[in-house]
Every structure is written in C-alpha cells, then in structure tokens.
Amino acid sequence: MAIFYKPSKGKNKSNVKGRVRGAGSGEKQHIVKTKQSWPSVDDINAANEAVTIDGMDWQGQGVARGDTLYFVDGALPGETVEIKALSSNKQIVNAKVTKVNTPSEHRQKPFCGVANQCGGCQLQHVEPQEALALRDDALKSMFQRKLGFNEGAWQAPVSGNRPRYRRKARLAIDARNPDKIKLGFRENAGKNIVDIEGCPVLVESLSQLIAPLKSAITGYASARLVGHVSLLAGENAVQVTVKHTRSLANDFIASLSQFAVEQNVNMTIEDGNGEFTHLHEIAPITCNTVDGFYLQPGPNDFVQVNAEVNTKMVAQALSWLAPKAGERIADWFSGLGNFTLPIANSGATVSAVEGVAEMVQRAKSNALEQGITNVDWMQLDLADEKSVDKALAGGFDKVLLDPSREGALTVCHALVRATPNTIVYVSCNPNTFSRDARVLIDGGYQMQKAGVVEMFPFTHHMETMALFTRQQQ
C-alpha cells in the first residue's frame, strides 16, 4: 500500500492534525501524521495514492491491510486501485474505487446498465461464484476468530440460480413532476431514485411490470401521494401493492385497476393507516415452502426474496434439526410458518412464536387449511425477558431461531437457562449472529455445523445457519 504515516519526532504532545506534505504541485504528495492524530478524509484524497487489495470481507468490500486498514467498495483481491475516502476513524478508512489500475481476472462488466448508480446491487463487478467463495471464506475466518469453532464444522454454501432470483421488491417513486415519473430503486449512498424500465435480478414476471406500471401512474396528480410500490411473485399470481399517504383520486384508482386487469395481477392499495383496499384479485398469493406446504402472505408480510434458496435453506435446517414425533420443538420468530409447517409434519409438537399478531393469525389459519393441528401459535415480544422465560418454562427438546437483523440476544440468554438439547439458528446478520452465538457457547453449547446461505446474490447481505448442541456436563 502506498499511503504511509510518519510519527512526529518532536516533544510537543498537543493534538496536532495530520497534514499533506509535498515539495511542489508536480511532485507526489505524502500524508505526514503527527503522534496523536490520523489523516482526515481530505488528507487521504489529496494524497491520491493507490492501494493494493489483499482480501475481501463478508460484505464484498475489498480489504487492504497495512498501517491503515482500508475497506474499499468496488475493489477485488489482487487489484491495485485508486480510491476516494468516504470516512476515516483512526486506523480504519472506508472508501470507494475511482479507478482500477490492475484489474482482477475475476472482475466482470456489470450485466445491468445502471449497476453503478443503483443501490439495489453492489457486487455485479465480480464473477458470482468467486464472490460467493471469497465471502464464504471471509465469514468462516470471522467466525473462527470470534467463536473458535472447529474448521471441519464449516459446511458448503447454499446457493441457487442467478441472476433472476428476486421474487419480491419495493420500488421507490419520484412523482414531483407527474408527467415525468421516476420509478425504481434508490441510488447507491444517496436519496435520488434511479429510474428503470426493468430489473435483471427480478424474476421476469415482476421485471416486465415496471414499464407498464410507470405508464399507468404517469400524468396523474395522485401519483404525488404514492410512497412506494411493492411487488411479490407467488406460485399462482403476482401481487402489486401501492402505498399512499392521502386519499387517491378516482381517475388514478381506475388507472391502477385497468393496469391490474391488463397485466392479470392482484392490485391492492394501502392507506396511511395501514388499511387495504383490493382493487383486483386473480387469486390469494401462495408461496411454497417444503414437503408440499405453502404460505399465504398478506401484502406486507415477510417472505424470503429468493424462492429457490429458501427451499434449500428450509430443507437444510430440517436436516440439522432432525425433528421427530413426540419431541417438543420451539420455532421462534416463526413468521408465516416457513419452518413451522414442515417441522410439524414430522409429528413433533411445535410452539410457533412470532412478534406480529396479524402474521400469527394468518399462519394459524393457513396451517389449519393444510391439516396441521399440532402447533401452538403465539404472539410474543421476544425481546421481553420475562415473557420469553415464561414461554420456555414447559421445556423443549429442540429450538429453531430465525430472527430479523437485530438478532435474538434475549432469547439466547433464556435458552442457556432453559437448556434444550439442540438449537438451529438462521441469521440474516452475521454480526448479531456472532454476538448471540458467543452467548450460547459461553452457556454450554458447541457449534457443530455452520455455513453460508446466499439468499441475496450481488448484494452486501449474507445469511448464515448454525447448529448448536448442548455439551454433556
């Protein structure tokens, strides 16, 4: 790495800011650091020196190590790149690539024309298999460093087909000029909307709706009242939900209805109070899980965006959990029953706990419709220690956790006290997972298996799954 620092040799210990030194405008500048300060973003950018990337973190950022640790968006291992520093905190600099001097053999041209502006994807510049391999290795190294598990416990990653993997999306809208509407995703590190006609990572049934939907809402004053548009492709139909802040004019509603009829999709509008009006419905949306079961999400319910990888993920979780008839199993953060239904199909008695009351009722109704009666569905605040301890008081043989990005810290502390034999933890945030896993390990559990689930190709996000078993005392 070319950027370097020189400590001050003087005895003055005052906090003097770092500065850039150069003999003249034609000479290369170098950052000079005094003893108690680090160069500012402006200092780093003024130096305009290249860095060599020697690794990748689990989010897909290039890493350059030296006196300073650089995390560089858009850079790949082995590359020498010029950068723009975005933030600097002591020995850590966050930056983005401005020029690639020596490209990696794994660098590719993004397959989307707006990939460099759109905030939807961050990793189209690297071959997808290489991105998965590098990030898989980065996560394994991070977990080994923080959790100290046996390397042989690391499992092959779960992945699926690319690039059209997303069955769900939320489109932002800029209708300040109703005659020139922008419909798309927010730009990378900004608030502006990148206008699109289609999206190459959406399933085709969603991507092909974007252009006609924009036409349907262009020219209407009510378009200014739309906050966002949600799309969901089910097994049997497509759901379009338009979120609005105030009452929509009749002509705008009529245009949405006509669009739904012409495109043969479900159309729902949602007002500022969360009330839904169904303008057109082909059929209630269904999303398959495993063993022939399906979910029936409402317009705002959570479902995994990647249908193929979700099926593989559920199958692996079931294999690791190994539910059996007669066992008592807790499926917490259960949502609509993505894991619950196939677990219950084993004959085990299941406690399904979810924080959103509407999803609990929908999940229960859907389960009964499919003949599943051995589940106790419960709405519970899983961040409340007393409620969690009370719900665990009956005792469970096994537990499956699938929390949101905030993790399951309260639940993990409670599980250490409740001592179930087996825990399968599915996480969408490796940082909160490693925090929670440390609680379990310190509380007497051993991480037997762990691995990556590539739910979101081409993005910074990564899911993980781990199996914990209670150590014999």
UniProtKB/Swiss-Prot annotation:
Looking at the record, which segments are called Disordered? 6-27
Residue ranges constituting the TRAM domain according to the UniProt record:
42-99
In this chain, composition skew of type Basic residues spans 8-20
Biological process terms from the Gene Ontology for this record are: rRNA base methylation
Q: Does the keyword Isomerase apply?
A: no
InterPro entries registered for this protein in UniProt = 23S_rRNA_MeTrfase_RlmD, MeTrfase_TrmA_AS, NA-bd_OB-fold, SAM-dependent_MTases_sf, TRAM_dom, U5_MeTrfase_fam
One GO MF term attached to the UniProt entry: rRNA (uridine-C5-)-methyltransferase activity
Output the CDD domains linked to this UniProt entry: AdoMet_MTases (cd02440)
Alphabetically list the UniProt keywords. 4Fe-4S, Iron, Iron-sulfur, Metal-binding, Methyltransferase, rRNA processing, S-adenosyl-L-methionine, Transferase
List, from the UniProt record, the residues annotated as the active site of this protein. Answer: 428 (nucleophile)
Top EC group:
transferase
Which NCBIfam families does the entry mention?
A: rumA (TIGR00479)
This protein is called 23S rRNA (uracil(1939)-C(5))-methyltransferase RlmD
Q: Which organism is it from?
A: Alteromonas naphthalenivorans
Q: Which gene encodes it?
A: rlmD
